[in-house]
């Protein structure tokens, strides 16, 4: 079980549903290894604890020339969110970019080491049910993540790991997914783990 940086912001009902789901895995003979049980898992958790910053820095830097061109050509057709992201990226240096590439590589090395311990990883796909969005009624205070918080997606992004999201939870009558994550370039095996999960584990609902 990989907590990622997202676990701390998961609501209690979603945590309850997920823990009940993990219990089903254990009842089916699957050993769930947590960070408190393994130094390898703890090392991986530490390496992905700022995965969002790493991912956003890398993609922001790599895209900022294209975004700058769009803003220069059609400033009124580009969202304020993109302009804000562009400003952050343009404040970076090549050294900042290189540092984040190195941090990404450290995370990938830690992920590879975990393969000696576990066949795959499981985590949530989001911190809870979809949020209510006011469509940015207040233009001076933009909602940071109008389509939901991607905290649980950053880790797999920087790891370059195959993952399958399955809607196995229902919280407050809204769907919440889990992710089955494999090692890099082991897409087929990750898919097989997800298939087994879907066929052998019952969905959990918490109202």
Question: How would you label these PLM feature ranges?
Answer:
Residues 1-8, 15, 19-28, 92, ...:
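Structural helix-boundary/capping segments
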Residues 1-2, 54-108, 162-175:
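Short helix-loop capping/hinge segments that flank enzyme active sites or metal/cofactor-binding pockets
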Residues 12-36, 68-73, 97-118, 146:
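Acyltransferase
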Residues 30-52, 86-87:
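Short connector loops at secondary-structure junctions
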Residues 53, 130-150:
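Short, surface-exposed loop/helix-turn segments at secondary-structure junctions
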Residues 113, 143-166:
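Small-aliphatic-rich amphipathic alpha-helix that forms the alpha element of a beta-alpha
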Residues 126:
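Short glycine-/small-residue-rich Rossmann-like dinucleotide-binding loops
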């Amino acid at each position: 079980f990989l907590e990622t940086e997202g676990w701390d912001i998961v609501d209690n009902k979603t945590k309850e549903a997920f823990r009940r789901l993990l219990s089903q895995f254990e009842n089916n003979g699957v050993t769930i290894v947590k960070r408190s049980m393994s130094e390898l898992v703890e090392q991986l958790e530490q390496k992905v604890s700022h995965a969002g910053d790493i991912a956003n820095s890398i993609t922001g830097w790599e895209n900022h020339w294209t975004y700058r061109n769009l803003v220069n050509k059609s400033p009124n057709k580009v969202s304020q969110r993109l302009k804000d992201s562009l400003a952050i990226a343009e404040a970076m240096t090549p050294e900042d970019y290189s540092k984040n590439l190195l941090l990404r590589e450290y995370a990938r090395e830690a992920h590879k080491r975990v393969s000696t311990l576990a066949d795959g990883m499981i985590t949530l796909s989001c911190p809870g049910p979809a949020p209510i969005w006011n469509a940015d009624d207040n233009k001076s205070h933009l909602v940071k993540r109008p389509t939901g918080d991607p905290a649980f997606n950053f880790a797999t992004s920087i790891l370059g790991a195959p993952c399958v999201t399955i809607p196995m939870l229902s919280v407050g009558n809204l769907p919440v997914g889990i992710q089955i994550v494999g090692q890099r370039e082991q897409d087929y095996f990750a898919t097989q783990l997800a298939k087994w999960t879907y066929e052998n584990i019952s969905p959990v609902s918490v109202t």
